[in-house]
Curated annotation (Swiss-Prot):
CDD domains cross-referenced by the UniProt entry: ATP-synt_V_A-type_alpha_C (cd18111), ATP-synt_V_A-type_alpha_N (cd18119), V_A-ATPase_A (cd01134)
Residues annotated to bind ATP: 250-257
NCBIfam families per UniProt: PRK04192.1, V-ATPase_V1_A
E.C. numbers: 7.1.2.2
One GO biological process term: Golgi lumen acidification
Name the UniProt record assigns to this protein: V-type proton ATPase catalytic subunit A
Record's GO cellular component terms: apical plasma membrane; clathrin-coated vesicle membrane; cytosol; endosome membrane; extracellular exosome; extrinsic component of synaptic vesicle membrane; Golgi membrane; intracellular membrane-bounded organelle
Catalyzed reaction equations: ATP + H2O + 4 H(+)(in) = ADP + phosphate + 5 H(+)(out)
Record organism: Homo sapiens
Family under the similarity heading: Belongs to the ATPase alpha/beta chains family.
Outcome, altering residue 371 to G: In IECEE3; uncertain significance
């Protein structure tokens, strides 16, 4: 929000409007003489005017969590009430920017202060007032038109990827008395004036919205379109939908951040909001370094991915209280773009740090701790965040649909999934991508454990698959059966060895190895495999399962005859086919293109059928 417009202590005429600091305990400050203050009201604390939020009221005492470092605040310092809740500014200029947890623009602060640190009590508006944006009003609006909350009244081309639709804030309505002609305006210029019941109100391109409040929608819709991640194991076995909720729990070093970053880079979302919440600063700088170089092709033009991304950085060395706010800031930005009719993905890395911030504040307030010292309301807070996801019919005209998908990384200490944060999260989310330390140690990435992970969106996506990839659902079921069977056989193999297994079981083991090593495993740092389009995923799986079916049939049909076909014979005769199967992943979707990859896979299937025919003859 625009902190420069908030009242300042020096400007106040009456001292009676101040409260006074009564006690300081880390980020928690208690203040007296605060009668009339509201819950979650924004306040300025001390002579440095630090930003804080009231989290408890008792008599005329208020407990405030301060979003900045509180060293130097002393008893008796003034506390100024602003009369507003913690809010964010929504308007052109969000894309490509990097904010801290309470939406202060880090690049602007850095250029103004020439410092690598954020000074305390800094006053900078979240969206720059200097940049001029090219505003085009909607053709069907003129003076005298009626307009209501959520209606789009203008369009700003924020960059070549995002057309920023300027909407009327949800609670306003009236008759247009002025609308700005097409031209260049900054975010403080009035572009619309309305009259309602004799009262005129002016609007700029920016709207302010409280972060803890859900933005209203017309209705929630069932989600039915997959969120394609470009990771084979996720798209094929545990799909998520646009508007879904996903948790990625995993111990340190399992690759949570790499999965969230590859989602940001390659998923089929229109807008990405990446919230780094209490994680390493290096991870955010890596995103800032990598994303501008990464490109995507839109209508034949190559564009930087940074143009569709906004970052909310709240690293582990920033004040603890702001971690809690950063998650709400991120989800409010996501809902704003959803209201324009975009499909938004929000990455929260990691919600465990957010829960730890809740625990620290709760401990300072001397609240009764629950499991592992987390507050009793941990589950409710997590739910209030995850339930803001979903596919919706947006408010206002023209009619449009948008969605917010949330992907939350969870880092349980020691990779223990019975941790309170993980278990509370799993009760809320619909998709669980469980990362396995053992797989990560074997350098099998993405280290998603295919036996414990699940997705509850399978049924919802059946219609989509039937329409576009008819053969896919039975293939997925078969692949899961093979992997499950291999897990059951693993114990027997350890006891008696591979040689004493039945021939069909040997085939199951070999095909499971093929699926694990050459389908589920994916090298995110190579041009051919960092992103796998869905047609390639289906083609690869289809050929592997076809090989499995043919091999089993060949073994079973000749089991009673004199010239038996065993697995060793198949392996001997089909070394070339097996090599081709395991190198299907090396086809580069950008260089080779969809048509060539599909024809290559079809050719491989034909070669396989011919090879099995000649073997049986």
């Amino acid at each position: 929000m625009d902190f420069s417009k908030l009242p300042k202590i020096l400007d106040e005429d009456k001292e009676s409007t101040f409260g006074y600091v009564h006690g300081v305990s880390g980020p928690v400050v208690t203040a007296c003489d605060m009668a009339g203050a509201a819950m979650y009201e924004l306040v300025r604390v001390g002579h440095s005017e630090l930003v804080g939020e009231i989290i408890r009221l008792e008599g005329d005492m208020a407990t405030i969590q301060v979003y900045e470092e509180t060293s130097g605040v002393s008893v008796g310092d003034p506390v100024l009430r602003t009369g507003k809740p913690l809010s964010v500014e929504l308007g052109p200029g969000i894309m490509g920017a990097i904010f801290d947890g309470i939406q202060r623009p880090l690049s602007d602060i850095s250029s103004q202060t020439q410092s690598i640190y954020i000074p305390r009590g800094v006053n900078v508006s979240a969206l720059s007032r200097d940049i001029k944006w090219d505003f085009t009003p909607c053709k069907n609006l003129r003076v005298g038109s009626h307009i209501t909350g959520g209606d789009i009244y203008g369009i700003v081309s924020e960059n070549s990827l995002i057309k920023h639709k300027i909407m009327l804030p949800p609670r306003n309505r009236g008759t247009v008395t002025y609308i700005a002609p097409p031209g260049n305006y900054d975010t403080s210029d009035v572009v619309l004036e309305l009259e309602f019941e004799g009262v005129k109100e002016k609007f700029t391109m920016v709207q302010v919205w409280p972060v803890r409040q859900v933005r209203p929608v017309t209705e929630k819709l069932p989600a039915n379109h997959p969120l394609l991640t470009g990771q084979r194991v996720l798209d094929a076995l545990f799909p998520c939908v646009q508007g879904g909720t996903t948790a990625i729990p995993g111990a340190f070093g399992c690759g949570k951040t790499v999965i969230s970053q590859s989602l940001s880079k390659y998923s089929n979302s229109d807008v990405i909001i990446y919230v780094g919440c209490g994680e390493r600063g290096n991870e955010m700088s890596e995103v800032l370094r990598d994303f501008p170089e990464l490109t995507m092709e839109v209508d034949g033009k190559v564009e930087s991915i940074m143009k569709r991304t906004a970052l909310v950085a709240n690293t582990s060395n920033m004040p603890v209280a702001a971690r809690e706010a950063s998650i709400y800031t991120g989800i409010t930005l996501s809902e704003y773009f959803r209201d324009m009719g975009y499909h938004v993905s929000m990455m929260a890395d990691s919600t465990s740090r957010w829960a730890e911030a809740l625990r620290e504040i709760s401990g300072r307030l001397a609240e009764m701790p629950a499991d592992s010292g987390y507050p009793a309301y941990l589950g409710a807070r997590l739910a209030s965040f995850y339930e803001r996801a979903g596919r919706v019919k947006c408010l206002g005209n023209p009619e449009r649909e948008g969605s917010v998908s949330i992907v939350g990384a969870v880092s349980p200490p020691g990779g223990d999934f019975s941790d309170p944060v993980t278990s509370a999260t799993l009760g809320i989310v619909q998709v669980f991508w469980g990362l396995d330390k053992k797989l990560a140690q074997r350098k099998h990435f993405p280290s998603v454990n295919w036996l414990i992970s699940y997705s509850k969106y399978m049924r919802a996506l059946d219609e989509y698959y039937d329409k576009h990839f008819t053969e896919f659902v039975p293939l997925r079921t078969k692949a899961k059966e093979i992997l499950q069977e291999e897990e059951d056989l693993a114990e027997i193999v350890q006891l008696v060895g591979k040689a004493s297994l039945a021939e069909t079981d040997k085939i199951t083991l070999e095909v499971a190895k093929l699926i694990k090593d050459d389908f589920l495993q994916q090298n995110g740092y190579t041009p051919y495999d960092r992103f796998c389009p869905f047609y390639k995923t289906v083609g690869m799986l289809s050929n592997m399962i076809a090989f499995y079916d043919m091999a089993r049939r060949a073994v079973e049909t000749t089991a009673q005859s004199d010239n038996k076909i065993t697995w060793s014979i198949i392996r001997e005769h089909m070394g070339d086919i097996l090599y081709k199967l395991s190198s299907m992943k090396f086809k580069d979707p950008l260089k080779d293109g969809e048509a060539k990859i599909k024809s290559d896979y079809a050719q491989l299937l034909e070669d396989m059928q011919n090879a099995f025919r000649s073997l049986e003859d």
